[in-house]
């Protein structure tokens, strides 16, 4: 579905560029090259305005940034440009044309990796991470979370099916999950429903473990489940997130590594990505979409995967529970 929608969005943008170019060409009597250039700049300005709006909204819900993670004006501008380019690349190329969900995998002597994307994305989001994984000899699989606006609990069975398939095809009895944004919550929903017997590690990138104020402006049941109401100090997560938090024991939390940025422009408060009992790793100067595209994050994820490969088998596993409702 996301693949189709992003292709339709590209077609609409192309039509808009041609319409603006024609208006400039015949209304202002510029040449076609100039008219097309102006039309393209208009498109870039609109897309950049969307990115600016995300940062403005995130600022309203921001958490305090530790001194060592603060940015000067130049570093912030560089981060904004990187996030804008990451968003353009992801929505205009990776998600429309590079989807690779459920691709078959080979047998592996080491634990394989399951990639879970976030809200409004598909498996194409992970395209830039494929080369580092291939170079490291990692066997991996990605899934698409659909329906796009569904209850996050409904993604649990999709994750379960992918885990079973990945174990069967790789010949391993456990997997490592790497999840971006809402994908981390889908992984937590899966663990609550199915237990952690088949999971060696969960590495989340910019996941709103306690919600995000930006979700208040989004559509779908999954957005409502990711709500954060109020400011960073006095606000509160959704009922669903609170119940999810209460359902997890220490053994489950110890499986998690939460990687996040203090300048995340979608997850705000940014410290919402911190998960008690987990290993929390903070970065600065990286936006939300850029997390899975940045070489520094690639290196960190690879380090955590290699660390999970060296872990001994768990002594105790948690058991499955019933899905959480908002009642």
Task: Label each residue range with its predicted role.
Residues 114-124, 132-246, 250:
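Serine-dependent carboxylesterase/thioesterase catalytic core
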Residues 1-113, 321-327:
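Flexible, membrane-associating and regulatory peripheral segments of lipid-active enzymes
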Residues 28, 192-327:
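Helical cap/lid subdomain of alpha/beta-hydrolase-fold lipid enzymes
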Residues 78, 112, 176, 257-259, ...:
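Residue-level marker of motif borders
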